[in-house]
Amino acid sequence: MPILSKLNKRVRARVEEDDFEHFSQESASDGSELGEEDEETDDSDGSTSESDDGSGRDGDESENEDLESDSASDANSDITSSLNNISFGALAKAQASLGKRKRSTTLTADIASKRPKGPSRSPPAPSSKEDQKYPNATKPPQKLSHRTSKHAPTIQSSRHAVTRKRTVIETPAIPQARDPRFDSVVLNHSTNGNPSIATNATIHASKNYAFLNSYRTEELSQLRKRLQNLQREKSKDTHDEREIERLKRQITSMSDRMQTFERKEMEREVLAGHRRKEREAIREGKKSQPWFLKKGDVKREVVTRRFTEMSGKEKQRALERRRKKIASKEKKEMPWARRGVE
């Protein structure tokens, strides 16, 4: 204790002023010895006092901690005893009064609704000068809002990748020509709104304008006669030679177009005949489900029909053309000879 340390402290008597000179003369010889003894005693007294003070403080802190721990343990024991006495019915009522747990999105929505509605700050609109300067400038990317829950549908951007081709000069929009023969709107109007005709516009257009094929055949025959006349004259004029080349190109293009029309018409006939057979088989009960032809099967059937309808000379020409085509393809696929090999 601090009081005991003060009582145990060694104190030296105060020297009077009148006896100071006498004391100084007597103690002149023993001054050094007394000084050393006083220093040692002072050091020992200081250490004992410090130790006594430290022990006193530690004792006070330990007593305070013991009191706090006792009070906390008493409070915890009271709380646990009160919780043990609560019934399950009271706990259920308390939970029902609190309500179900809400999601964070509803809380944020409530907070946003409670906020004062002020004038929303919109981004500054670009000036007309900037629009004229950069007409093809892309808009800044917008951040996608997150889903409200994991069960909500995913949010995906409708933006597409920008093409690497740069448009230097924007061409004006040119109105495209519309052919009424192949227009579904015109065919639908002319057929009293029949949807099957509107969907198969090309088929019905070819049926409606089938008389044009006769005009094409007549025009093709006239071009061939004109070409024969120019070739008979055998003039060395450059103008006639150019005309002959032009007529040849026109005849080949028209003949190829006629062949494509015939081939498509034959494909339609093959498909129509196959569908007719399948319907009859289903009606008779021979089949439960129809069988649909593939594109390769249709092409094979068309080739066989065309080959059977050809005459002897036409068959030979077709076979020779086919042989040359296969030979050229095989020649391209053959490896080239090495340089060092003879």
Curated annotation (Swiss-Prot):
Residues 1-81, 93-177, 309-342 are annotated as: Disordered. It comes from Paracoccidioides brasiliensis (strain Pb18). GO terms for biological process: maturation of SSU-rRNA from tricistronic rRNA transcript (SSU-rRNA, 5.8S rRNA, LSU-rRNA). InterPro entries: RRP36 (IPR009292). This is rRNA biogenesis protein RRP36. The keyword Ribonucleoprotein applies. Residues 33-53, 60-71 have a biased composition (Acidic residues). The lineage of its organism: Eukaryota, Fungi, Dikarya, Ascomycota, Pezizomycotina. Component of the 90S pre-ribosome involved in the maturation of rRNAs. Required for early cleavages of the pre-RNAs in the 40S ribosomal subunit maturation pathway. Residues 309-319, 327-342 have a biased composition (Basic and acidic residues). The keyword Nuclease does not apply. It comes from the Eukaryota. Its main location: nucleus. Residues 213-267 form a coiled coil. Keywords: Coiled coil, Nucleus, Ribonucleoprotein, Ribosome biogenesis, rRNA processing.
